[in-house]
């Protein structure tokens, strides 16, 4: 493992010395072994100070190094941070970059574990070289000393909120259990990075209304963690009920009609092999019955008027069933939003609206959910969308049991319905064509 991540970093040729650090000297008069810790603090002195605070026995401390003895075992901790100066900073950056590159290339069936271990390393700002040794006596006594050393290292690692190497061939947590080894094996069923101790927006000066947004964010983060999906608490909050401009029921009903029309149109092209003119004739009755023309966005109008839309565009608009599902949920036609592990039920979504004879009857028969429910769902899907996009952008394994396209489209629908990040120049009630649907802000 150690050689593998050396090949992923800008090592200066001292590989032989580094490998000796991990080699256990079993037959010498003294038993010696070494491990690495990866911790959050960005300065070696910070790590050394924290370690010295944990030690009850006498110790020596100099800069980022701490030495002490515990029941006949000698320990040495040397910490190097990315905010240190000179060679210490270079070493810390090389090690962190190297182990991250190694993990990227590691083949494993444990995709969630790998992704979350990479996020843990991303949070780290320091590397600690841990060395311990003791005088050999008997095989049993040696095993007891090794166990003592392992327990002491794990106790310190727990306080540092980090991860460590184990035997030079695996990465482990403070409980000593192997998270991943160099063969891609794992001893943990689930693994998640620790929550940040404090988000960047929290503090004594926070405004009262912001507490609502912070509580909503924390709720979403914890919901995702229960599904083994990590998102950082540092991601921005979304609007509060006071700030958001929820769409009116009339707008959401009209948007549902527009989405049903373009979705059916795409289905005719892709699934039934119709020509654009045939597909247009097929959806004409639906569009007229629900006055969809009044609610089409510019991109939807262009798509429906294009005599030869390309395949990619057809696929893009076929995903609008997911947004239709969101609108129908917002209007109370579905009791809950199912987890986006699969696409929504296309047949059921189409049938929900087609039960009504007109837009007016549709609008009279439904009730819009409270702003709070829309914002709760919007916040959750915003963070789920981030998890999918960030994993893809970094080349990490995608979250398991999530269809990224469905998550992205549902986030669009929820942001629009709840009135999050309204389009520039838009006023309450909607003045842009299509009520600003094309301008929905999906940035992270």
Short names for language-model regions:
Residues 162-163, 169-170, 176-183, 329-403:
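Conserved binding-pocket/active-site segment within a compact domain
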Residues 368-444:
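Alpha-helical oligomerization segments
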Residues 247-350:
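Long amphipathic alpha-helical segments with strong coiled-coil/leucine-zipper propensity
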Residues 69-74, 80-281, 301-305, 309:
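Extended, non-transmembrane interaction/recognition domains
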Residues 224, 272-301, 366-389, 443:
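An acidic intrinsically disordered interaction segment
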Residues 9, 13, 42, 46, ...:
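Alpha-helix boundary/N-cap detector
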Residues 1-87:
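Charged, amphipathic alpha-helical stretches
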Residues 236-243, 289-313, 384-401:
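Short amphipathic alpha-helical segments and their helix-coil junctions
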């Amino acid at each position: 493992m150690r050689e593998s991540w050396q090949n992923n970093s800008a090592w200066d040729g001292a590989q032989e010395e580094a490998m000796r650090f991990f080699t256990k000297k079993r037959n010498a008069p003294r038993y010696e072994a070494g491990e690495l810790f990866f911790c959050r603090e960005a300065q070696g002195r910070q790590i050394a100070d924290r370690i010295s605070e944990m030690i009850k026995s006498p110790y020596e401390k100099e800069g980022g190094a701490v030495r002490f003895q515990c029941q006949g075992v000698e320990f040495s901790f040397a910490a190097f941070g990315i905010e240190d100066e000179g060679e210490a900073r270079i070493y810390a950056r090389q090690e962190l970059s190297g182990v991250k590159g190694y993990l990227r290339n590691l083949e494993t069936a444990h995709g969630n574990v790998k992704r979350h271990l990479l996020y843990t390393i991303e949070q780290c700002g320091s590397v600690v070289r841990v060395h311990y040794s003791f005088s050999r006596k008997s095989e049993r006594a040696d095993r007891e000393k090794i166990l003592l050393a392992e327990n002491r290292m794990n106790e310190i690692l727990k306080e540092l909120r980090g991860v460590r190497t184990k035997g030079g061939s695996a990465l482990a947590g403070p409980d000593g259990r192997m998270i991943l080894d160099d063969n891609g094996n794992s001893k943990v069923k689930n693994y998640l990075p620790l929550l940040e101790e404090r988000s960047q927006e929290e503090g004594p000066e926070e405004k009262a209304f912001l507490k609502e947004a912070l509580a909503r964010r924390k709720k979403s983060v914890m919901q995702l963690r229960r599904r083994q999906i990590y998102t950082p608490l540092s991601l921005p909050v979304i609007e509060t009920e006071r700030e958001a401009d929820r769409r009116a029921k009339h707008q959401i009903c009209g948007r549902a009609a527009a989405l049903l029309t373009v979705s059916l149109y795409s289905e005719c092209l892709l699934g039934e092999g119709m020509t654009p003119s045939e597909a247009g004739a097929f959806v004409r009755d639906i569009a007229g019955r629900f006055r969809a023309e009044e609610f089409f966005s510019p991109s939807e109008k262009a798509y429906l008027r294009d005599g030869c839309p390309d395949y990619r565009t057809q696929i893009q608009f076929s995903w609008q069933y997911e947004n239709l599902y969101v609108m129908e949920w917002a209007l109370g036609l579905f009791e809950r939003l199912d987890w986006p592990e699969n696409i929504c039920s296309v047949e059921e979504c189409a049938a929900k609206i087609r039960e009504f004879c007109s837009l007016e009857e549709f609008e009279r028969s439904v009730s819009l959910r409270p702003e709070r429910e829309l914002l709760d769902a919007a916040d959750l899907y915003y963070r789920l969308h981030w998890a999918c996009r960030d994993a893809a952008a970094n080349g990490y394994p995608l979250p398991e049991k999530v269809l990224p396209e469905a998550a992205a489209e549902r986030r669009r629908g929820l942001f629009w319905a709840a009135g999050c990040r309204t389009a520039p120049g838009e006023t309450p009630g909607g003045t842009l064509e299509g009520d600003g649907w094309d301008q929905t802000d999906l940035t992270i």
